[in-house]
Each structure stands twice: as structure tokens, then as C-alpha cells.
Amino acid sequence: MSRIGKQPVPVPTGVDVMIEGQKVSVKGPKGALDLTVAEPITVSRNDDGAIVISRPNDERRNRSLHGLSRTLVSNLVTGVTEGYTTKMEIHGVGYRVQLKGANLEFALGYSHPVVIEAPEGITFAVQAPTKFTVSGIDKQKVGQISANIRRLRRPDPYKGKGVRYEGEQIRRKVGKTGK
């Protein structure tokens, strides 16, 4: 049996979970999220009030969906209680970020400023001209927006300039040697 899938998802106080067939709806202090679980997987509540994910048989596809579904439901519960945050930083001379309303405006060495609009459920915060955070309750959305921002100017392997996650180690290359 899936080691991750067989563990029940604890539901903290203040979180309301609705299960209707394959659809799981979670409401908490930070907001509400929905998830439709893949077909062979079933979702139910146990006596403790925890969410239990089960599969009908041990087919390969069902085994893989079992752990995935449990993790996705767990991410919903964590999202509506704590939320998710990605810390990012910018390295490079003249590279900076500023908050314009709810949107981020980047100066990344292009001939124009790059504006990233905040989608619904995502908030940006700027701590310094080179440090900012992406926050929200949906883990997938926070990660996707962070990846899109990083893609604006990927870290350069020679000088390390660009947008990166906080604490990310960039593999550096040695430049050409002169004669």
C-alpha cells in the first residue's frame, strides 16, 4: 500500500471539509479551495474527523493516484490554514522590483519595465528592491507564478545575475581564460 496515501489527513479546528463524490471542498480561515479527485480514488472521513483516501485495487495507476490524491488534499488543508509563501531575490546591477498597486514591476535590464499582474488569490510583498515574496492559499498557483517570475530573467551561470528563489544555489561556470 502507498505509504503516503494510507496516512489520514488531519483536519484542524476551524477547517470545514465537504466531500461530495469525487469533489473535496475545504474552507478555512484564509479562504476556500476545491479539488476533484481522479476517478478510481475515493475520499471519506473517519471517526476522528480526518480525511481518508482509499483506492479500489493495487493497479499501477491506482497506486500512483493514491499518494498523489492524499498529498493534494493535504495541500488544500495546509493552504486554507497557513497558506504558502515563496521568497525570491534578484541579483544584478540595476535589477530591482517594486510594488505598483497589487502588481509587481521589474527592471531586469530590458528596454522596458516588466509588469506581473497578481492573479486572484495571489498577493505580492516587496521587502527590499531586490527581495520579494509571492503568497497565496493554492500551492500550485504560488509555485507557478514564482516559476513564471523566475523565467523573466533566469540566473546566469557565469555571473549569477537574475531572479532566483531565496537560498537557491546557482551552478557557476568558469569563464574563458585569456592568453
Swiss-Prot record:
InterPro entries assigned: Ribosomal_uL6-like, Ribosomal_uL6-like_a/b-dom_sf, Ribosomal_uL6_a/b-dom, Ribosomal_uL6_bac-type, Ribosomal_uL6_CS
Molecular function as annotated in GO: rRNA binding; structural constituent of ribosome
Pfam (any one): Ribosomal_L6
GO biological process, one term: cytoplasmic translation
Highest taxon of the lineage: Bacteria
Keyword Zinc: no
Statement: the UniProt record of this protein carries the keyword Ribosomal protein: yes
Function summary: This protein binds to the 23S rRNA, and is important in its secondary structure. It is located near the subunit interface in the base of the L7/L12 stalk, and near the tRNA binding site of the peptidyltransferase center.
Family label: Belongs to the universal ribosomal protein uL6 family.
NCBIfam families: L6_bact (TIGR03654)
Subunit structure: Part of the 50S ribosomal subunit.
Entry protein name: Large ribosomal subunit protein uL6
